[in-house]
Amino acid sequence: MSGGQAFSADRNGGGDMRAMSYRIISETGSREDNIKRLKKEIETADAIIIGAGAGLSTSAGFTYSGERFEKYFYDFAKRFGIRDMYSGGFYPFPDDETLWAWWSRHIYFNRYIDAPKPVYDMIYDLVDGRVAADSVIEKKDEPVAAPKKDYFVITTNVDHQFQRAGFDKKRLFYTQGDYGLFQSVNSKLKKTYDNEEWVMKAMESQGFVKDENGVFQVPEDGKLSMRIPTELIPKCPDDGSDVTMNLRADDTFVEDEGWKLASSRYSDFLRRHEDMHVLYLELGVGANTPVIIKYPFWQMTAANPNAVYACINYGEAFAPEVIKERAICIDGDILTVFEEMPKIH
């Protein structure tokens, strides 16, 4: 794969993408050699910066179409002709009761349950597991045992699965929001609001029942309501105004104090490690939002001769030729790659 796109080596990931021309390459060795190299880099890197996109959650089993959609949204599919969870998020439902019934299901089955497959847990085991109290994110933080590797995660995913797997929230930057948060339509309120309690009530009101593990399931008779009671329509707790999801769709997205703090921590982590042996590990990042993770990772790798860029993605694993010698591109399912890694020596 090749192209005449542009690329610059900017340490902060912002850089002028027109600064130099380059070719894109996808071949960096055999699959086995690439996995072996990645395994070594994970073991030897001073720091690992994980950039995660939608492909990681897909690998974890959070698919937006197919069996999961047909199981939990069959009634919406039949009535409205909706074919997947993603497009359903944009559907013009007839009233707020139906709109929020949809969203409560969408949130619950993508945010408040554990991932069907263990890829997040496998990544956690590679980088975390507390061993020593010699590394903290901020000086003002109370000293805590450090992870196996000094790491940070930046992700465009909004499903909270890194935290559910045990990752330290002080090492996470969710750039595009969180399914677990509402924001007010009142633009003057720059706050977000936890929605877990509301989601549980809304799910129950539609007829979902909890199984022996406390997870909501479709009842045996299959009867569900596609509306929530009017009194359950979520409102802003501060001024009673309507709420929307805290998901980046336009300039109304609220970057609250938690978001700003995470952004600051991420920038500080990059600064402190800019000349060290850093592994930029990109997982499941596609071409929809390359300026958030992919391009900055390329730029920072080019700027630091001690850095290595690794990409695992199904059908979209490539890198600029300028960093070819320090690039590891693996085309395939992320879970499968991490399952193979312990077997390769």
Where are these regions (language model features)?
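Conserved catalytic alpha/beta core of Sir2/sirtuin-type deacylases, generalized to analogous enzyme cores
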Residues: 1-345
